[in-house]
Amino acid sequence: MAPDLAMKPKGCWRPSLAKGTIKKKIFLGEKMTEYKNIIVTGGAGFIGSNFVHYVYNNHPDVHVTVLDKLTYAGNRANIEEILGDRVELVVGDIADAELVDKLAAKADAIVHYAAESHNDNSLNDPSPFIHTNFIGTYTLLEAARKYDIRFHHVSTDEVYGDLPLREDLPGHGEGPGEKFTAETKYNPSSPYSSTKAASDLIVKAWVRSFGVKATISNCSNNYGPYQHIEKFIPRQITNILSGIKPKLYGEGKNVRDWIHTNDHSTGVWAILTKGRIGETYLIGADGEKNNKEVLELILEKMGQPKDAYDRVTDRAGHDLRYAIDSTKLREELGWEPQFTNFESGLEETIKWYTDHQDWWKAEKEAVEANYAKTQEVLK
């Protein structure tokens, strides 16, 4: 029987159980560590709020404290309907040592999602990325160290840089070194990815130097409900819904390894409860697609011509290809992705943004105006 991954009844997405979309419930093995009081940083953002909903729906004995600064990418509405006895929201900065100390004293685990994550924003102003991604992570680690509590750090595959396209590789993307693994050397290429790499490294150092009970996960590109409309998939969907032509960087050959955010949630839970301290696990669902392919699929699903988009100037230092090898997570912890049909997941995501225009419409004009400062339509 498939697990109940339902979100809130209004303003939330209930994933389809259509054939080929969701597999059977994942097996996490026999020995799991139970946590009763967890802090989820960034739990009002896209990936973090989906994790909070996952815990709320699947682990009724767990109390969640969401610590979120509620910047433009955090939204109280993402968790509004589950706030109560089991989920509380604390509005604050993860770099506020006094606040973090107060919360950590009552917790037995921290799941650290909070991050500044938009590459374009990091190129315009790197300072918030240093503050949140590095100083914030340090502050949380010190609290975990003080109270000897479990710490899981949620990171990105972008810390590894990028890979050549499959057609340019001897193993066509499946050979040794042709996907990211936990052994891949760090090679970040943007202010965003460099601050995430730095935060990964201090987690590793705090494990080795101070015995902090920490793990790290590096995940590929997420999609699903609650993603801010500055991001690639929701931006294209909301452009079409707003009568604006979608925008494609350059030739659109850049490849991303897509994973549904609910699969990310189950992966993080598996690592939190069963992962080996000090280990890094990569979370991916074998979802490699180039940006042009994804955009054309969105256009097709929304009844538009496949060429009804504008090409714009490419992002500086735009990484070419990401690809995750999640063998370690699958074999060691028994995790498997449930959303294996990208088209079905994309259809559900399109439906969510179509049905919840009140969630994103107020921000649409400002988001496009911000992009217009740096993007020029190519002829």
What do these predicted ranges mean?
Residues N78, L163-K179, P191, L201-T273, ...:
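NAD(P)-dependent short-chain dehydrogenase/reductase
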Residues N50, A77, K102, N121-N124, ...:
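Generic recognition of short, well-ordered alpha-helical segments
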Residues P15, L28, I39, F51, ...:
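C-terminal substrate-binding subdomain of Rossmann-fold SDR/epimerase-dehydratase oxidoreductases
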Residues K25-N222, W352-H356, A362, A366-K379:
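N-terminal Rossmann-like NAD(P)+-binding domain of SDR-like oxidoreductases, especially those catalyzing
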Residues N75, L83, P225-I229, G287, ...:
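Residue-level signature of the cytosolic catalytic core of signaling kinases
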